[in-house]
Amino acid sequence: MAISVRIHSLLPNGSQRVEVGGRLDTHTYGELDDRLTLVLAAKVQSLVLDLAQLDYVSSAGVRSIFRARKLLAARGGTLVLANTQPQVQKVFDIVKAVPLSEIFRSVEEADAYLDRIQKKILANDED
């Protein structure tokens, strides 16, 4: 099975949503890497990976997501996961590659979290 990657429009607040579906494994991680490289080249401050349609993730897929998270964190950004399927969630639980506080049941929950983070940062800057 192939991977599908759908990139949504960049929001004015610098948040980007990317839907990932299918299988993320040794045969498909390169495509996700390529697409995320394009996304991260923009002025993205927060990235929501919507994994509702992701059926399988291998260690290569975990590395791909971790790489994007690391690149974004290096410039003060945040990567969160939303809508993880139980079998995919189990992989992240086992490898502990993504803190549980950065995995959400829905895109709306992830967006609310990112809004809180940004408001908190702005509030601290004003003090």
Describe each model-derived feature in a short phrase:
Residues 26-101:
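Amphipathic alpha-helical interaction surfaces in cytosolic regulatory modules
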